[in-house]
Amino acid sequence: MFRHGVRTFATTSLRRMAAVAPQEPSQYLLNVSKAQGIAKGLTGAIGNTPLIRLNRLSEETGCEILGKAEFMNPGGSVKDRAALYVVKDAEERGLLRPGGTVVEGTAGNTGIGLAHVCRSKGYKLVIYMPNTQSQGKIDLLRLLGAEVYPVPAVAFENPENYNHQARRHAERLDNAVWTNQFDNIANRRAHIETTGPEIWAQTGGKVDAFTCATGTGGTFAGTTRYLKEVSGGRVKAFLADPPGSVLHSYFSSGGKLIERSGSSITEGIGQGRITDNLKQDVDLVDGSMTISDEKTIEMVYRCLDEEGLYLGASSTLNVVAAKEVAEKLGKGSTVVTMLCDGAYRYADRLFSRKWLEQKNLLGAIPEHLQKYIVLP
């Protein structure tokens, strides 16, 4: 009798909790919402990523510094959004039919995102990339089902650039499309329709500035466009740039493309031209800044130590930019940035003493954080 009573009570309690779960926190303080229901395949799980408060930096600046956790996308990065949209765009325009082939020139996360999306939709994927990329990256893309062609790394203006080779490959095939991530504005549309609205909803419209770096231009331009329009221009937009990129000099010089030498430890960001994704929204940029590799690598270690966030260098460059924008705007401001991906694909470099010494970056990491340098 006693056991039966306990069972009845437990069943009744669980049913009551299930009934209220979509509306309020459970007894374990986990916010369970209808949005976290069953995704319709892999593509249904792309987007709707959390916005994480970076506690230590928020306390330091007296602002709310928030990072969009794009590493939680199924392919592990913000590029899943663009990958899905460029494929959907090709489908909608009749350029890609069942059993077709997607071709792209990419050296990083866009290829991984496309590999996941193409596998889930039944398309073949062909990737052209510079032969300077690691064997591990090539192996990963092949593991995900892609056909990979590493080609000599040459400037965009050279007809043998990996992007142009990808275009020509697609032209030779029937039922194939070159998704052209840099100049295909479906990339930008992904962020106008998903990232921007998510940020606005998650902050309840209480956002003062958005900042991130850009490679294709899609994330920065699309998110900026939405936030500017929905706020009536109130939200400020600041572009962050790694060393060697021309974008900061372009905006700070009033529109002059000035060649810059040098390189950065970051991957997938920085640019030598104004892409079509960025071109439409250059007038929306309120300011720009160059973030040094020294600041970026220090923030890799700070985010791990202080926030428990294991982030890649492009993500921590964005975090540094968000901190600088917060300091510029003053206490009480809310600044949002993108946590593009995690450090999992870069650990053999970012946490290697030998690599840090080769890049002259070991001294940029405070001594108390060097305990995380666990690789030789």
From Swiss-Prot:
Modification N6-(pyridoxal phosphate)lysine, positions: K79
Record key words, sorted: Amino-acid biosynthesis, Cysteine biosynthesis, Mitochondrion, Pyridoxal phosphate, Transferase, Transit peptide
EC number: 2.5.1.-, 2.5.1.47
Involved pathway(s): Amino-acid biosynthesis; L-cysteine biosynthesis; L-cysteine from L-serine: step 2/2
EC class name: transferase
UniProt-annotated location(s): Mitochondrion
Binding-site residues, pyridoxal 5'-phosphate: N109, G215, T216, G217, G218, T219, S314
Single GO biological process annotation from the record: cysteine biosynthetic process from serine
Span of the transit peptide along the chain: 1-16
GO molecular function, one term: cysteine synthase activity
Catalytic activity annotation: O-succinyl-L-serine + hydrogen sulfide = L-cysteine + succinate; O-acetyl-L-serine + hydrogen sulfide = L-cysteine + acetate
Protein's name in the database: Cysteine synthase 1
